[in-house]
Amino acid sequence: MGSEDLERLLLGYALRDAVKHGGRASVGSVMSMLLGDHPELRSRAREIASLAARVVEQVNSMPAGEQKRLLSEQYPELARFEEQREKGDKGLPPLPGAVEGRVKLRFAPNPDFVIHMGNARPAIVNHEYARMYKGRMVLRFEDTDPRTKTPLREAYDLIRQDLKWLGVSWDEEYIQSLRMEVFYSVARRAIERGCAYVDNCGREGKELLSRGEYCPTRDLGPEDNLELFEKMLEGEFYEGEAVVRMKTDPRHPNPSLRDWVAMRIIDTEKHPHPLVGSRYLVWPTYNFAVSVDDHMMEITHVLRGKEHQLNTEKQLAVYRCMGWRPPYFIHFGRLKLEGFILSKSKIRKLLEERPGEFMGYDDPRFGTIAGLRRRGVLAEAIRQIILEVGVKPTDATISWANLAAANRKLLDERADRIMYVEDPVEMEVELAQVECRAAEIPFHPSRPQRKRRITLCTGDKVLLTREDAVEGRQLRLMGLSNFTVSQGILREVDPSLEYARRMKLPIVQWVKKGGEASVEVLEPVELELRRHQGYAEDAIRGYGVDSRLQFVRYGFVRVDSVEDGVYRVIYTHK
């Protein structure tokens, strides 16, 4: 980044800080904002601090009105953010250097498994920014490691399905394994420019770099290295015998940054790729492929986890080599979902080592998007929680209670109410003044016109939960009448609702015997799956698989399957 661009950035941050703090900006705050948005500048922090001090002094000498005017005119996105903050609006902060209509972002999953809550964060955040700036969104499958991160053929479509369910759409789609010739072309150009070379020292090459030395081929000219690269492509080297390295600093304090590997040989006869089989032997590493594609696809902003900060430094080496302008890099903290496993490797291990115990990648005990969907969590709830967390650099843990609260608020407006009893007790009905009574119960309190009619007559049987059917207790059957529990009989007392209110009677759910549906409730509790048996009212038969319901006084559930008249539902939350 040139000095003029740097000074302009510092001026924007200083104006924003001054407007936020009554006309006074501080060097510390300005540097924090700059390095948070541009971690690649951290190595120049000492040099930049003196420039920041001059810019802050300049801004602090301005009248407050002038500060606001300059911020609004020259940095409208930063000004908009301050306006949102003053109003208390929640939302994502502005992107540095963003121009409406020219922002382009990407979500780039590895299709070695389905996506989980942690992966959903960059997908949703990038998509939201693309919408905010009327920009474009790219979906890019990063599948260039068939050896250690073997792609799954089915994962491509499963990821697409999960993204669509989350409301994430994209304008362009790419699969890196289908772009191999592009990577070869850029590798050749990097070698021609003298900033990449073929290390054919095998295992010794890595050992040399660990001592701050290097393979002698580093000192060869571009022509010789290009010849070696063509031999790699033609299969004259075996896996592990030769790699292409970016020329960085063989004595860099961080060994992983010393002439890192850009291309390597993978024996695809042993490790075939699910899309291209054994067509290619030489494969780009993650950092090389990402750098090339982010440039070729004109990505303006890269938003990803802070675990990629070291990768950012590696990728900048490619940009410097090729003379490309890098995108803006923004790193946010890791995201955890309390009580759920998000690790792909751990989930795969559980599925492999404990077959038959879990339902698959979409088991409701897992934090995969498919698992949360199967549990009954709505996409809107996930999106809402992730946007609230935003792009903060600190790690964040979402509690299940918070996600459930967001989901409950949405479900409460949508889910029909169904009566369900667990651990049932059969009771006989004895009405006092009439032979029969009819209950008209709305499926949803806000839509009273949709209701079911259930008629009970003297001698009919009903099912109550054991904890409600306490001897001598008075209670009200929902929508019907008031009763006393007496030796297996429900004896009607005053039928009025006023009586129930005056006596503060519990209003309980009930199921008429004879039309009941068998229900199995699966309750996920961390890695345990508790099973409960009960009965639901006949009205449940109007709902199919994937219906979200509220079992009255029990909780929200999602219908997972209906087999032989038995409804299997998954307990979502209270």
UniProtKB/Swiss-Prot annotation:
According to UniProt, the reaction catalysed is: tRNA(Glu) + L-glutamate + ATP = L-glutamyl-tRNA(Glu) + AMP + diphosphate
Q: Does the keyword Nucleotide-binding apply?
A: yes
Superkingdom of the source? Archaea
Indicate the principal place this protein occupies in or around the cell.
cytoplasm
InterPro entries (UniProt xref): Gln/Glu-tRNA_Ligase, Glu-tRNA-synth_arc/euk, Glu/Gln-tRNA-synth, Glu/Gln-tRNA-synth_Ib_cat-dom, Glu/Gln-tRNA-synth_Ib_codon-bd, Rbsml_bL25/Gln-tRNA_synth_N, Ribosomal_bL25/Gln-tRNA_synth, Rossmann-like_a/b/a_fold
GO BP field: amide biosynthetic process; glutamyl-tRNA aminoacylation
Motif 'HIGH' region, chain ranges: 109-119
Keywords linked to the UniProt accession: Aminoacyl-tRNA synthetase, ATP-binding, Cytoplasm, Ligase, Nucleotide-binding, Protein biosynthesis
Q: Which GO terms describe its molecular function?
A: ATP binding; glutamate-tRNA ligase activity
State a single Pfam family of this protein.
Answer: tRNA-synt_1c
What is the top EC class of this enzyme, as a single word? ligase
Known EC number(s)?
Answer: 6.1.1.17
Q: Where in the cell is it found?
A: Cytoplasm
Q: Which GO terms describe its cellular component?
A: cytosol
**Protein task:** Catalyzes the attachment of glutamate to tRNA(Glu) in a two-step reaction: glutamate is first activated by ATP to form Glu-AMP and then transferred to the acceptor end of tRNA(Glu).
Question: What family does this chain come from, according to its entry?
Answer: Belongs to the class-I aminoacyl-tRNA synthetase family. Glutamate--tRNA ligase type 2 subfamily.
From the Swiss-Prot or TrEMBL record, give the protein name: Glutamate--tRNA ligase
Q: Which organism is it from?
A: Aeropyrum pernix (strain ATCC 700893 / DSM 11879 / JCM 9820 / NBRC 100138 / K1)
Query: Taxonomic lineage of this organism?
Result: Archaea, Thermoproteota, Thermoprotei, Desulfurococcales, Desulfurococcaceae
